[in-house]
């Protein structure tokens, strides 16, 4: 079979020329175009050298690029080629740079697909692999390429303004969110937003599945798009019994026993007609992982069109076939992937989650975010996060907690292989909120180039993924900043490239009990402190976090009745306010209703 080489010489030349002649053009593409996107080696060398100029905060132009090429002893052939290319720049003026970028990326993706298909064919002959593993590895190869398909999106402000106005116009005529049917909750959330990851958490038997089914039933009644429930705990038949019980107000136990009167059969028949017309789909396959869910959704979308809402019951039962020695690392990967699924399919994705036992050991048993994330916290007196004040670009120590809307040094992590962060790029991120998380025992962690003081629950990035400080050993290597590289030119901050190194752990010492703090960094969910890269919580992948709490669950001496009150606590809401609403819980039918019915 003839092998076709996918490349476009003119497009590659055009991009190099554009970088050299147009000020700030490189800033628009350097995080989106990698060296390997270029097919010709000479262009790869030139683009890599341009990257170095940018990293060193040197103006990108022909003289500086030539100087760098000479200093790095690049061959005269490449240097002469660059001079010839630059002198020929006028011939590229009539070309559209966006077209050239599209052609460049199109050819790169075709090359990568060609290579991936060859790898997949090779994998099919490895009979030591199960079919499930083969499909997973194949999906991973293709999904990695798909990330490049979304990288380049240069748009003028006029184009963006037009798109925004059209979007606003659509919103005036059609709702772009999903109403839950719980009026007070919708008042806070303004419905469930597309591309959001929503976590509904509570202790066992608090009513998570019941709340989910009531929500799904409401949504299906309000809007007609397909709703998909992935139930990893209960069978489809169990869920159907619940739905029938909710619809007929007949207890599930009586339905299972067949203890139905003649008049109730009429109610049951009407309920069957109503439920049959709802656009709800159930999948009760167990041992699902996130790639299975992504694959199933893609198939469902081809059959039924756009999907309106996805529900997963529940998070802790989701699998990841490439096993990690620590479950919390798997869950961190899973939640991040679920968020990507919500964005890719442009729909709200609801995930039910268990809560830790920490709730049971407090007098006030209402859940808080730390019960979900179980993350650690930092001492501000002894640590130095790399802060950037909003009115200048100087580094500063953290001397108070009033740092909202200031900037901090964090990192983007490219997860090309699960649990292995292949590329780490320091970037500047906005601090959305600071949190005082308590008065706790802290430990001093000594490593090769610095020291950090933290609770042992806080996560740091190692070569094997995120680990709690308590779980670190002397064999672990943790992600740290190359400080000498960082302070280049004293105060410049936008010179970062891949200047993250891994340092060995030396010692862990218990210190004393002090006030500790955490930060909300919305996009990267991590930040550098004393040169160490730390995670600022697992739950940050979620856009909305809801907790369910019923007093009667703990107050067993309360008189039993046919109705019960349940608090739905909006503990996190990325798009708006937080708060609490009350709903009625019916233990007889295991369902939720609005506290005050619409007149």
Swiss-Prot record:
Subcellular location: Plastid, Chloroplast
Organism of derivation: Guillardia theta
Family label: Belongs to the helicase family. DnaB subfamily.
Record carries keyword Plastid: yes
Biological role: A replicative DNA helicase, it participates in initiation and elongation during chromosome replication. Travels ahead of the DNA replisome, separating dsDNA into templates for DNA synthesis. A processive ATP-dependent 5'-3' DNA helicase it has DNA-dependent ATPase activity. The intein is an endonuclease.
Molecular function (Gene Ontology), one example: ATP binding
Pfam families named in the record: DnaB, DnaB_C
Lineage: superkingdom: Eukaryota
EC number(s) given by UniProt: 5.6.2.3, 3.1.-.-
Keyword Repeat in annotation: yes
Annotated S-S bridges: none
UniProt catalytic activity: Couples ATP hydrolysis with the unwinding of duplex DNA at the replication fork by translocating in the 5'-3' direction. This creates two antiparallel DNA single strands (ssDNA). The leading ssDNA polymer is the template for DNA polymerase III holoenzyme which synthesizes a continuous strand; ATP + H2O = ADP + phosphate + H(+)
GO cellular component: chloroplast; cytosol
Chain sites annotated for binding ATP: 202-209
Protein name as annotated: Probable replicative DNA helicase
């Amino acid at each position: 079979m003839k092998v076709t080489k996918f490349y476009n010489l003119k497009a590659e030349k055009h991009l190099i020329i554009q970088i050299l002649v147009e000020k700030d053009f490189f800033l628009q593409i350097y995080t989106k175009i990698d060296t390997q996107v270029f097919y010709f080696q000479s262009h790869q060398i030139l683009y890599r050298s341009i990257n170095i100029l940018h990293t060193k905060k040197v103006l990108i132009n022909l003289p500086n690029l030539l100087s760098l090429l000479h200093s790095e002893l690049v061959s005269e052939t490449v240097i002469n080629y660059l001079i010839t290319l630059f002198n020929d720049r006028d011939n590229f003026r009539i070309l559209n740079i966006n077209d050239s970028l599209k052609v460049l990326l199109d050819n790169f993706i075709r090359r990568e697909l060609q290579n991936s298909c060859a790898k997949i064919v090779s994998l099919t002959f490895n009979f030591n692999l199960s079919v499930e593993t083969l499909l997973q590895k194949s999906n991973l190869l293709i999904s990695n390429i798909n990330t490049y398909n979304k990288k380049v999106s240069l748009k003028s402000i006029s184009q963006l303004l037009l798109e925004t106005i059209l979007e606003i116009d659509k919103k005036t005529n059609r709702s772009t969110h999903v109403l839950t049917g719980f009026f007070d909750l919708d008042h806070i959330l303004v419905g469930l937003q597309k591309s959001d990851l929503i976590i509904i958490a509570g202790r066992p038997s608090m009513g998570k599945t019941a709340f989910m089914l009531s929500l799904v039933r409401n949504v299906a009644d309000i809007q007609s798009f397909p709703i998909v429930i992935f139930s990893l705990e209960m069978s489809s038949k169990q869920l159907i019994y619940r739905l029938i019980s909710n619809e007929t107000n007949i207890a599930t136990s009586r339905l299972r026993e067949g203890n139905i009167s003649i008049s109730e059969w009429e109610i049951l028949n009407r309920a069957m007609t109503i439920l049959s017309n709802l656009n709800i789909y159930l999948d009760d396959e167990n041992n699902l992982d996130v790639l299975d869910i992504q694959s199933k959704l893609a198939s469902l979308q081809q059959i039924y069109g756009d999907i309106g809402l996805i529900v997963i019951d529940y998070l802790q039962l989701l699998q990841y076939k490439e096993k990690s020695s620590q479950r919390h690392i798997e869950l961190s990967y899973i939640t991040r992937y679920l968020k990507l699924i919500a964005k890719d399919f442009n729909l709200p994705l609801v995930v039910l989650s268990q809560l830790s036992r920490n709730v049971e050991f407090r007098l006030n048993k209402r859940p808080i975010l730390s019960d979900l994330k179980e993350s650690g916290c930092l001492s501000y007196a002894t640590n130095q996060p790399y802060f950037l004040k909003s009115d200048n670009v100087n580094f500063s120590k953290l001397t108070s907690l009033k740092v909202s809307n200031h900037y901090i040094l964090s990192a983007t992590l490219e997860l090309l292989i699960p649990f292995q962060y292949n590329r780490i790029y320091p970037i500047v991120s906005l601090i959305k909120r600071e949190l005082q998380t308590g008065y706790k025992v802290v430990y001093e962690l000594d490593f090769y180039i610095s020291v950090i003081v933290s609770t042992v629950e806080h996560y740091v990035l190692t070569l094997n993924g995120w680990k709690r400080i308590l779980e670190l050993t002397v064999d672990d290597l943790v992600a740290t900043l190359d400080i000498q590289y960082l302070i280049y030119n004293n105060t410049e901050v936008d010179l970062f490239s891949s200047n993250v190194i891994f340092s060995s752990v030396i010692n862990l010492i218990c210190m004393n009990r002090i006030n500790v703090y955490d930060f909300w960094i919305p996009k990267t969910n991590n930040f550098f402190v004393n040169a160490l890269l730390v995670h600022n919580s697992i739950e940050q992948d979620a856009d909305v976090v809801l907790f369910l709490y019923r007093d009667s669950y703990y107050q067993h001496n309360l008189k039993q009745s046919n109705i019960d009150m349940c608090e739905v606590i909006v503990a996190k809401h990325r798009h708006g306010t937080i708060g609490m609403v009350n709903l009625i819980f019916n233990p007889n039918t295991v369902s939720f209703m609005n506290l005050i019915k619409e007149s």
